[in-house]
Amino acid sequence: MTLLTAKSISKTYREKVAVNHIDLTVKEGQLIAFLGPNGAGKSTTINMLTGLIQTTSGEIRLAGLDPKQKEYHHKIGVVFQNSVLDGQVTVQQNIQNRARMYKNIDLDFENQLIDDFGLTTILDQRYDTLSGGQRRRVDIARALVHQPDLLFLDEPSTGLDIQTRKVIWGTLEKLRETRGLTIILTTHYLEEAEEADFVYVIDHGEVIAHDTVKQLKEDYAQNLLTIESENKDAVLAEIDSSWSVVQEKGSLLIKVPNEHDAIDFLQRVEPMITHFEFRHGNMDDIFMALTGKEIR
């Protein structure tokens, strides 16, 4: 079932167009990734979807609600790239202050969040004394305390170590499985985008491609087979005429449709090669194909 729609939303600051007529459809339980470089318009899009800023034009609906309605904000949780929590009070107070904004908070759920995000031992610490990873875990737990239908994460993994990312995403995946949580995140981390159900590639304020990760890879990414051989001419004679081949530093760089074709080809030329390496196409390949530049 569709949870959120955005129809031709735009944001203009004086003469500068930050977001240009973006359309979105988000289904319940999905993990949606906005992938793009810094300045692409990802955060501005999130800010419009969360009601932090108004659209210049276009329409946003969440379960039939408009961002100007109070009920809209009861259905969402937001974690901004830069924290908005009170640094002068404890972790526990920050979470409780958020909980008081809503009726019928489930204390068992709140305590489970605290446990799952590993916050039990730091509840009495002031927020401004925490490390970056600890702060981010508190930010996300606080945003979830009222059990929203939709969680917005703006660059959630920036500056975090691998272990902290693992804790965060392990907990979020658990909530997706048990409670049907829907997540929209902005990221320039390719690993995060790889896990999404659906990806919107954004550049210069526009959606330049949108589809499942699998389909985007099929359409834009290239699987690369690198071969070293003392008899390159014989190897070249076996290559499918539709494949792209480049000779570089004594190696053959072959773009192949999929790993099965690569395996079949390697079996044919095995006696002729001294070394090979196969690399799957990835999100960086997709972004390079679409924009001509790397995402990092």
Model regions: which residues?
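Conserved ABC ATPase signature
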Residues: R126-L130
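ABC transporter nucleotide-binding domain
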Residues: T171-K255
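Conserved ABC ATPase "signature" region
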Residues: Q96, L107-I122
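Short, charged/small-residue-rich alpha-helical element at the C-terminal edge
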Residues: Q222-R296
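Conserved ABC transporter NBD signature motif
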Residues: G58-Y72
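Catalytic Walker B motif of ABC-type/P-loop ATPase nucleotide-binding domains
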Residues: L151-D154
